UniProtKB/Swiss-Prot annotation:
It catalyses: [protein]-peptidylproline (omega=180) = [protein]-peptidylproline (omega=0). PANTHER family: PEPTIDYLPROLYL ISOMERASE (PTHR47833:SF2), PHOTOSYNTHETIC NDH SUBUNIT OF LUMENAL LOCATION 4, CHLOROPLASTIC (PTHR47833). Its EC number is 5.2.1.8. InterPro entries: PNSL4/FKBP13-like (IPR044183), PPIase_dom_sf (IPR046357). It comes from Vicia faba. Its main location: plastid. One of its GO terms (cellular component) is chloroplast thylakoid lumen. Expressed in leaves, but not in roots. One of its GO terms (molecular function) is peptidyl-prolyl cis-trans isomerase activity. The keyword Thylakoid applies. It is found in: Plastid, Chloroplast thylakoid lumen. Keywords: Chloroplast, Isomerase, Plastid, Rotamase, Thylakoid. This is FKBP-type peptidyl-prolyl cis-trans isomerase, chloroplastic.
């Protein structure tokens, strides 16, 4: 089963902030590979 991790924000060079709430146990994605993700977008104001 996946493990729930504390949410520490990572900021990408583009300014996008993200965190991994659940870290899976499968193989890591590589650049160019199609992935499936669930996300929540929020605005500052």
């Amino acid at each position: 089963a996946a493990e729930v991790a504390p949410c520490e924000l990572t900021v990408a060079p583009s300014g996008l902030s993200f965190c991994d709430k659940v870290v899976g146990t499968g193989p890591q994605a590589v650049k160019g590979q199609l992935i499936k993700a669930h996300y929540v977008g929020r605005l500052e104001n």
